[in-house]
């Protein structure tokens, strides 16, 4: 890692020297960043879309680990720590990476406009895997693993869509990095808020 760090210190382009600005100038620019963000065409519809895109994930993913490890008598699947780590951690991560890579090829071939609806469906519908696991409570690790790996693959496949949507529809402009950061923050909020409520819903 140290060798890579030294290599990048020498090979990466140097940033141009920054001109020091007063606090008042910096504040005015920050205000302009916010104003220009909300002046973008269709921005409010875009923000609603971004917020809803990962809403299902927020409701499912915070409570899913507890569900998978909880006792069958309490409605869970009763996975051991070893099986949980193997299925949810190792196999799920590999499936996520493969899904992301294939999604990149899919979008580059057909374009984001033609693929966005299918990406929304691919991202959200597989969360029904957890509903099916809760209903049938299978004990067979192959069935459990197949369902979770499928969900993670679909998650990786669909996640690329929302990332590219923010980059192509919201970020372009004078303050593209700041505007992308705003959109990304809202997207993460759509996961955090439902995640806080998911425990209450699960025990209601």
Describe each model-derived feature in a short phrase.
Residues 53, 62-85:
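Short amphipathic helix-loop junctions that connect adjacent transmembrane helices
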Residues 121-139:
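C-terminal ends and interior cores of transmembrane alpha-helices
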Residues 2-17:
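C-terminal membrane-cytosol helix-exit motif in multi-pass small-molecule transporters
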Residues 98-117, 202-203:
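Helix-to-loop junctions at the C-terminal end of transmembrane segments
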Residues 39-60, 149:
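Pair of pore-lining "gating" transmembrane helices in MFS-fold secondary transporters
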Residues 15-47:
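Juxtamembrane intracellular "pre-TM" segments in multi-pass secondary transporters
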Residues 81-82, 173-183:
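Loop-to-transmembrane helix entry/capping segments in MFS-fold secondary transporters
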Residues 157-172:
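Intracellular juxtamembrane helix-capping segments at the cytosolic ends
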């Amino acid at each position: 890692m140290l060798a890579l760090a030294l290599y990048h210190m020498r090979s990466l382009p140097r940033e141009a020297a920054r001109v020091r600005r007063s606090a008042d100038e910096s504040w005015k620019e920050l205000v302009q960043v916010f104003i220009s963000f909300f002046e973008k065409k269709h921005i409010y519809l875009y923000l609603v879309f971004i917020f809803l895109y990962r809403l299902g994930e927020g409701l499912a993913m915070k409570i899913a680990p507890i569900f998978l490890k909880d006792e069958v008598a309490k409605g869970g699947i009763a996975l051991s720590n070893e099986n949980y780590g193997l299925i949810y951690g190792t196999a799920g991560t590999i499936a996520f990476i493969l899904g992301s890579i294939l999604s990149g090829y899919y979008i580059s071939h057909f374009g984001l406009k033609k693929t966005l609806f299918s990406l929304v469906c691919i991202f959200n519908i597989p969360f029904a895997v957890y509903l099916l696991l809760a209903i049938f409570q299978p004990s067979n690790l192959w069935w459990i693993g197949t369902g979770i790996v499928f969900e993670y693959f679909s998650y990786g496949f669909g996640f690329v869509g929302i990332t590219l949507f923010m980059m192509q529809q919201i970020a372009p402009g004078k303050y593209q990095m700041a505007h992308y950061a705003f959109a990304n923050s809202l997207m993460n909020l759509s996961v955090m808020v439902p995640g806080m409520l998911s425990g209450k819903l699960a025990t209601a």
